[in-house]
């Protein structure tokens, strides 16, 4: 019998396959950007599978041809968590009900502040908020208007 801290083999495989299927694809935040253009740029996000557990990820503004961020990541299953190994900082995902929620490993400095990332992955969406927090607990960079909400367009 499975429990949250001890998955049987079948549940383990199911969760891993589901996560990869949901993660892979093309996303954009058109609905969010068009309803609030002064707060959110229109961004395309791509998670393109390059191997069994590897992806090439890109982010680009809709008005640009070239991405402003490009990276290769690897998905590593570790018991009841899924580790997304990222060149800057790994994300740790866990299935929570009907979604996967992820947070970054603490202690990583970016632009002179500690990186704080939170992500939610559903079957047709990807929500992310990143920010830099200084030693006084003040946000010094990142979205001031809430998370970016990406809708999945295709696989």
Residue ranges and their predicted role:
Residues 40-51:
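Short secondary-structure subsegments characteristic of cysteine-rich extracellular domains
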Residues 2, 8-11:
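Cysteine-centered motifs
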Residues 54-59:
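Extracellular beta-rich globular recognition domains, centered on the fibrinogen C-terminal
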Residues 11-18:
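Extreme N-terminal tail/first-helix region
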Residues 2, 18-24, 30-35, 50, ...:
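Calycin-type beta-barrel ligand-binding domains and close structural analogs
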